[in-house]
């Protein structure tokens, strides 16, 4: 299973938390962890040791910003927004499929069902976040002029068909679109505007559960998608928004305690890994 992340040093522990949650809840197999980074992470050794303890292979990818010399770059549009969109240019060419995950997610059931989703005829698989009304969806379609897409996809969980993406997704198209449009969420807007019609929709209640909307999920499911249902069935919880469960404040929510449990286990894992020299970490 190939996993992709894009972080800086502030999110090493959060990334390790995601990895631990995947390892504990996904059937044993090989995990290859690719991490896009603007500069080599100062906590590279921490991450390497954690991956070794989890039995995962760690592949850091330092991004050369010269790749984006023709891209529109401003304070609002830093080069890092292009990493996810152009991951196929940065990853080894012999990779065929990879799952991108934001570092603010938690895996609570087997990830294999998402990873094994067929992408035949599609560039990506992603989820559209549920709402009680479709007002936001209509606004986004008008804003991005992508009326033939199923909806507005959240790019925090993105299964990538790299072989097809390499043929269809071009940096010049992305740069030109950003240059000629004012965007709210630059990389996510580009993904939806240019490639929304080529994204396979997967259920957000399973693969990209927005933890802010637990009440909405229960309402639209007529009471079926309760906390117990989520714990049995949902694969990925996504801690969207400004409130984050690892913050000392602004960390309320029905799934905060669950995250804190994994986060605490991760800190213990990191501490244990630091006590061992690299050659003794298995």
Named regions from a protein language model:
Residues 43-90:
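Active-site-proximal specificity loops/subdomain of glycosyltransferases
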Residues 101:
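Catalytic metal- and UDP-sugar-binding loop of GT-A-like glycosyltransferases, i.e.
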Residues 31-38, 126-128:
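Short internal beta-strands
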Residues 1-7, 162-282:
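A glycosyltransferase accessory/donor-loop signature
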Residues 105-142:
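Conserved donor-nucleotide/metal-binding helix-loop-beta segment in metal-dependent transferases, i.e.
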Residues 98:
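Short aromatic/hydrophobic "clamp" motif used to bind/position activated sugar donors
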Residues 146-157:
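A recurrent flexible, glycine/aromatic-enriched loop bordering the glycosyltransferase active site
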Residues 21-29:
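Short, acidic, metal-binding catalytic loop of nucleotide-sugar glycosyltransferases
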């Amino acid at each position: 299973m190939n996993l992709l992340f894009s972080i800086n040093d502030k999110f090493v522990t959060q990334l390790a938390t995601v990895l631990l949650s995947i390892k504990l809840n996904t059937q044993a197999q090989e995990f290859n962890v690719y991490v896009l980074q603007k500069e080599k992470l100062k906590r590279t050794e921490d991450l390497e040791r954690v991956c070794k303890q989890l039995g995962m292979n760690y592949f850091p990818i330092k991004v050369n910003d010269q790749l984006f010399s023709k891209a529109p770059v401003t304070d609002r549009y830093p080069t890092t927004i292009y990493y996810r969109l152009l991951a196929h240019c940065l990853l080894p060419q012999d990779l065929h499929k990879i799952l991108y995950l934001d570092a603010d997610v938690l895996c609570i059931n087997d990830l294999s069902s998402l990873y094994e989703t067929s992408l035949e005829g599609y560039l990506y698989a992603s989820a559209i976040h549920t709402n009680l009304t479709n007002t936001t969806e209509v606004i986004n379609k008008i804003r991005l002029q992508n009326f033939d897409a199923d909806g507005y996809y959240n790019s925090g969980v993105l299964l990538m068909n790299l072989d097809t993406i390499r043929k269809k997704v071009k940096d010049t198209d992305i740069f030109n679109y950003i240059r000629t449009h004012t965007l709210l969420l630059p990389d996510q807007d580009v993904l939806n505007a240019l490639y929304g019609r080529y994204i396979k929709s997967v259920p957000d209640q399973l693969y990209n559960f927005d933890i802010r909307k637990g009440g909405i999920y229960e309402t639209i499911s007529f009471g079926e998608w309760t906390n117990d249902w989520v714990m049995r069935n949902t694969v990925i919880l996504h801690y969207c928004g400004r409130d984050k469960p690892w913050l000392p404040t602004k960390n309320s929510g029905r799934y905060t305690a669950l995250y804190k449990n994994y986060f605490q286990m991760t800190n213990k894992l990191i501490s244990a890994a630091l006590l061992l020299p690299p050659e003794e970490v298995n």
